[in-house]
Regions:
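Hydrophobic/aromatic-enriched cytosolic interaction surfaces used to assemble or bind macromolecules
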Residues: 1-251
Length: 251
């Protein structure tokens, strides 16, 4: 068995162009990836175009922390063919976009009538990213989030706006806990407001090598060093699979 884990480039954010809001479009052209023989050991890693990605028996795509929204609901009792429509009805007021523009996916082992988490992603964007990989003969078996609501809490510090050939321009904190997931810049007061003080003692803290110094200064305590490739592999071990409903893998 061989596993290829691919990082989908973060979705372009809204930005101002001549006073108007615009969103850059088009799938990413280069991907960070890792390979593993068993999902545990990191074998190789790198960056390349889709057509140059290593071949593997299983392909897992990972979405960036900020590209997945999270909603806590009671799962409606609906037959499989109508479940997606039922979810859209429940979440209509909570979603920032029209329900038809959002891809929804249920948490593993979700049960009707019970509280569960629903992941929300831009449908057009995700469909375009999967299509770009498929065009290069890279067929994704599972799509997973980089982080998801969980206990105990996880705090991960990483560089932002980084050019691989140059320095990072800032540090972000990705905070996953029982009530959701948030990504905020370390600079300013929002990160302090987000994390309880003191943080739960069981919180698992980590940072990329380039963010360790800032993370430890902010926390006042050591953190585990976790390279981006290690975090990709960790995400791939989750039970989540966002390829549901109309984006389910066709075999």
């Amino acid at each position: 068995m061989s596993i290829l884990v691919v990082q989908i480039p973060p979705r372009p954010r809204l930005h101002s162009v001549g006073g108007a809001q615009a969103e850059a479009a088009g799938p990413g052209t280069e991907y960070a990836y890792v390979t593993s023989p068993d999902g545990l050991a990191l074998e190789t890693q790198g960056h390349c175009a889709a057509a140059l990605l290593p071949k593997a028996t299983t392909v897992i795509a990972v979405l960036a922390d900020a590209d997945v929204g999270w909603h806590r609901i009671v799962l409606p009792k609906a037959p499989g063919a109508r479940l997606r429509a039922a979810l859209g009805g429940v979440l209509e007021e909570a979603l920032l976009e029209d329900t038809d523009d959002v891809h929804l996916a249920l948490a593993p082992n979700a049960s009707a009538g019970q509280p569960t988490w629903v992941a929300a992603v831009s449908r057009r964007w995700l469909r375009g990213e999967l299509a770009a990989l498929e065009k290069a003969d890279v067929f994704v078996d599972r799509v997973v989030p980089m982080a998801w609501p969980d206990e105990p809490p996880i705090g991960h510090f990483a560089e932002t706006e980084r050019d691989r050939s140059g320095p990072a321009h800032g540090i972000a904190l990705h905070w996953a806990h029982a009530d959701g997931v948030a990504s905020v810049r370390l600079q300013g007061g929002l990160a302090r407001a987000l994390v309880p003080s003191p943080a739960p003692p069981e919180t698992r803290w980590s940072a990329t090598p380039g963010a360790v110094a800032a993370a430890e200064q902010w926390l006042g305590a050591p953190v585990r060093v976790m390279a981006p490739g290690q975090r990709l592999l960790q995400a791939a071990r989750s039970l989540w699979n966002l390829r549901q409903f109309d984006l389910a893998r066709r075999t």
